[in-house]
Amino acid sequence: MKQKTHKGTAKRVKITGSGKLRREQANRRHLLEGKPSKRTRRLKGTEDVAKADTKRIKRLLGKA
């Protein structure tokens, strides 16, 4: 039986052309008034997934 893609992970992680994994940063959804502008600016954009997690996440996405 084929392994299914883990949809929760698929919605959160994108694979680049070179095979790296990118994710959005946490702490930028709500309650932003109390956070300094410097912090919210720093949290913009995407970040590489930690090297320790890459293998496991690729397996969840069916790309291992």
UniProtKB/Swiss-Prot annotation:
SUPFAM superfamilies the UniProt entry points to: L35p-like
Name of the protein: Large ribosomal subunit protein bL35
Residues covered by region (Disordered): 1-50
GO cellular component, one term: cytosolic large ribosomal subunit
Species in which this protein is naturally found: Corynebacterium diphtheriae (strain ATCC 700971 / NCTC 13129 / Biotype gravis)
Signal peptide: none
Record keywords, A-Z: Ribonucleoprotein, Ribosomal protein
GO molecular function: structural constituent of ribosome
Ranges of compositional bias, category Basic and acidic residues: 21-36
One Gene Ontology biological process: translation
Basic residues bias (residue ranges): 1-14
Protein family: Belongs to the bacterial ribosomal protein bL35 family.
